[in-house]
A protein has these predicted regions:
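Nuclease-adjacent, charged terminal/linker segments that flank catalytic cores
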Residues: 1-158
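Eukaryotic low-complexity, intrinsically disordered regulatory segments enriched in serine, proline
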Residues: 27-37, 192, 290-304
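A structural preference for short, hydrophobic beta-strand core positions in alpha/beta folds
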Residues: 202-203, 265, 285
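Catalytic cores of nucleic-acid endonucleases
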Residues: 230-231, 235-280
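Domain-level recognition of nuclease-like catalytic cores that cleave nucleotide substrates
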Residues: 269-304
Length: 304
């Protein structure tokens, strides 16, 4: 099953399309995304361009790449004179718009290469500055972004709403979807372990025991996967690219290895195949729940 356009699907285990990519395949997708904007319409085009790849994989790659692009350029959009120019352009156009057409916002965020949700945040922040006579609180700003009906200007509220639902990388809707998808994959992992009658402790149980930094799963009895011992499993509902995997290694995976021993990372939406190079050091990568799990107690009963 594919998710709705621009959203991630949790049915990754049964998706036959490629999720483990060579670096060359990954770079081909990245090159094509460089000139794209983070809208659901662009995701439809991306899906048509690479039909052999999971839509969830493509969206995850696109989102990671666009976020890198945004981090490099976001500071220039936050300059006071730039925000003022965006807002004045909006005010001039909004006065002359009789309908709730999205033509202005669509034109603006395409021209300046800023995601719809981030542009909406800048415009709303500036609008509230006039309305309240000072800098609005983040609480008020965030509540209006999540619930645009709270915005007193109905035309602006409609624009904010449309920007939020049209953005596939940023905004409260995307944040909510990503959080839900992450939790669903953790539940999926637990269900798979229970199907195999494997005893484990989940993250909540481990924290209750006093652990502060833990993987999603600690196996009470280690298993072997493709000949490698696994003590813990980490679930990642994203694509594993060079930058994110390097960050996870430094901030999470090696600390898990130091404390709990070798483990398994599941990138449910795929990863660059060349990154699976730490197996001998104790970190195994997969893009689905492994089918060849061997429990150590079972292995001990095998004849020599």
């Amino acid at each position: 099953r594919e998710a709705a356009d621009g959203e991630l699907s949790t049915d990754t285990a049964s998706d036959p399309r490629k999720m483990r990519l060579s670096r060359a395949e990954y770079k081909q997708i990245v090159r094509w995304t460089e000139q794209q904007r983070p809208t659901r319409q662009c995701m439809k085009v991306l899906k048509d361009k690479f039909p052999n790849h999971s839509q969830s994989t493509l969206l995850s790659i696109f989102s990671l790449e666009y976020q890198k692009r945004t981090k490099r350029t976001i500071s220039r959009h936050h300059a006071p004179d730039v925000i003022e120019s965006y807002y004045q352009r909006y005010c001039i156009i909004a006065v002359s718009i009789a309908s709730y057409s999205l033509c202005f916002f669509s034109h603006l965020y395409h021209c300046v290469d800023l995601s719809p949700a981030l542009m909406a945040r800048l415009i709303l922040d500036r609008f509230l500055l006039d309305l309240e006579g000072g800098m609005p609180s983040k609480t008020i700003l965030n509540s209006m972004l999540k619930e645009p009906s709270l915005i007193p200007d109905q035309i602006l509220a409609k624009h904010i709403y449309q920007c939020t639902i049209n953005d596939c990388c940023y905004g409260p809707l995307v944040d909510c979807i990503k959080h839900a998808i992450g939790q669903e994959h953790e539940v999926l992992l637990c269900d798979k372990l229970k199907e195999r009658n494997l005893s484990f402790l989940d993250e909540n149980q481990l924290r209750a025991m006093g652990y502060d930094k833990t993987p999603d799963i600690i196996l009470e009895v280690p298993v072997a996967v493709e000949g490698h011992i696994v003590h813990w499993i980490e679930s990642k509902a994203s694509f594993g690219d060079d930058h994110s995997h390097r960050t996870y290694l430094n901030e999470q995976f090696w600390s898990y290895w130091n404390r709990f021993g070798p483990g398994l990372v599941i990138y449910w939406y795929g990863f660059i195949g060349e990154l699976d190079c730490q197996r001998d050091r104790g970190i195994l990568l997969k893009d689905c729940f492994p089918t060849d799990i061997v429990t150590l107690c079972h292995a001990a009963q095998q004849p020599e």
